[in-house]
Amino acid sequence: GNVDLIREAIDAVPVDPSGLERMCEAVIATVVDHRDYVKNRQMAIILVTDESGERKTNNAMLEQAINTAKSVGCRIYVLGREAIFGYPYTYMRWRHPQTGDVHWLQVDRGPETAFVEQLQTNGFRRRRDAFSSGFGPYEQCRMSVETNGIFFMLPTVEVDQVNGQADKRRYELEAMRPYLPDLSSRFEQLGLRGELPMRTLIWQVITDLNPWREDVRDVTEVRMSFSINAQQFVAQAREEQQNCIIYLRYLARAQKMMEEAYELRTKETSRRWQANYDLIYAQIVGYQARIYEYGAALEALSLIHI
């Protein structure tokens, strides 16, 4: 083909000022707009993206995008980024061109699974890490697999991503094979979850401790900045200590639920879900120590200001 013509076509694509990544909608529109050209030829889409797409439209339109592509035998090849481990977002450094201020912009970048399988908190607040999952985003991998395409993971390290190269890991393919994410449909996985009590429990624990939920955010996100006024500081510290008590009860209850379900863990056939159990249990225990020390530090500082 004419490479220059292809480049011109790419350069002619207008910039979308909305900032939204309507990936599934774009796939559907592309197939529909070009399906009349498919006669005795193999249709293929090459999807190049550094995000995982809008979560709302991904949830609603992924299967429609797959079925639309299948209807004309269109294969989907994706050049994309590695998903964040068990988390929908990452944060990218952006320097304001006028002020020079650095801002951390939230970007959709995962997870590698149909539903999050890890805690969304780091113990103090919602996660802001960039731990590598070893796999591509669920939607992009599923589209590729279901249409007999391929997901190609871009290999370069993103220096502007939060933590830079500190959280970048390279995994051996064979070592990761037992931990491959389930790429079946969300509907199928939801039904299977209802039949497997341990997976249901893990989902409940993740949901109960999710700082993205507005109804639990006041408890699962602790205060990280305080007034420099001594009286106001003490009042804020006392309020946070009360929240810590509630949070510790949350965590203790979750730990007890996980311990009571250990027998289910021994019967679980998926190595990935066994690992999910182990990691979440360890985090719950560790977070209790973290919150206890946080409360103790507030107490020590309060005594200084009284």
Predicted regions and their residues:
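Active-site-proximal beta-strand/loop segments in catalytic clefts of secreted hydrolases
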Residues: G1, L47-E51, L79-E82, L154-V157
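Von Willebrand factor
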Residues: D4-M43, G53-K56, G80-Y89
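Loop/turn elements at helix/coil->beta-strand transitions in domains of secreted/extracellular proteins
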Residues: K39-A44, K70-Y77, T147-I150
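VWA/integrin I-like adhesion module and closely mimicked acidic/polar interface patches used
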Residues: E51-R142
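C-terminal "exit" segments of structured domains
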Residues: D101-I245, R249-Y250, K256-S270
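Residue signature of alpha-solenoid helical repeat architecture, marking inter-repeat boundaries
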Residues: R272, Y277-L279
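Conserved small/polar residues in nucleotide/adenosyl-binding loops
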Residues: H305-I306
